[in-house]
Amino acid sequence: MHYNIILLVDGTLSLEQANQVEQKHQKLLEKATEFKSEYLGLKELAYPIKKQLSAHYYRWSFHGESNCTKEFKRAANINKQIIRELIINREKDYGYLGSVNPKKQQLSLQKLTKYNEIIASENNPDNPDAPVTSGLASVKPRLSRVEKQKERELEKWTVVHQSGNFDTVQINPYRPRIKRFLQNNQQTSQANNNQPRFQNQFKKGAKP
C-alpha cells in the first residue's frame, strides 16, 4: 500500500533536534519500502497546539503493509515532541474500499484537502513563511461544556448590544432546567397558600 504522512515536530526544537526526532520515528515504520522524506520548513501554526506556536513540517512517502504504521502511531501519540501527524493510505482511502463507503469518501476528502493545502503553502514562493491556516493546524480546538456555555452567552449579548433592545433577552420556559425550576416555584407557592396560617391571615387582611 502507498502511504503519505505529514509530520509536525515541536517548533521550539532546533532543526538538528527535529531531524533526530523525525529519523527516530522513521525506524518505527515496519518493512517500509521506497521511502522518501522531505523537510517542508518551520511554519507558524494558526493556533497553539500542545502550547506550541510553530512546527517543523515533514512529508513522508513510502509503500508498506496495512499495519506498518501501527507502531509509529502509538509512539507519535505519546511523544510530546510530535505535535500532530496526518496519515493517508492512498489505496484504502482512494481505492475501491473508499469509493463504495460514503463516510470514508468524506473523511478522505478532508484529509486530501489538508494535505494539498500544506503542500500548496510550501510551493508558494511569494510567501513561504505564511502560517498554515487550514491544514493540520486549522482544526478548531474542542471546547468544554463550560466554555460552550460562555460562548453561547457571549453570542446572545452581542446580538442584544447590536440591536439595542434588552427586552429581547428572555428566559426560554421550555428548556428542561428552566421548566423544572418554574414548576418547583409554582408548587412551593401553592403549598404555602394552602397552609391554614396563610389562609387566615389573608381573610383578616393581615400581611403574611
UniProtKB/Swiss-Prot annotation:
Pfam families: Ribosomal_S6. GO terms for cellular component: cytoplasm; ribonucleoprotein complex; ribosome. It comes from the Bacteria. Residues 121-143, 185-208 are annotated as: Disordered. GO terms for molecular function: small ribosomal subunit rRNA binding; structural constituent of ribosome. The keyword Protease does not apply. PROSITE patterns: RIBOSOMAL_S6. Keywords: Ribonucleoprotein, Ribosomal protein, RNA-binding, rRNA-binding. InterPro entries: Ribosomal_bS6 (IPR000529), Ribosomal_bS6_CS (IPR020815), Ribosomal_bS6_sf (IPR035980), Ribosomal_S6_plastid/chlpt (IPR020814), Transl_elong_EF1B/ribsomal_bS6 (IPR014717). Belongs to the bacterial ribosomal protein bS6 family. HAMAP family: Ribosomal_bS6. This is Small ribosomal subunit protein bS6.
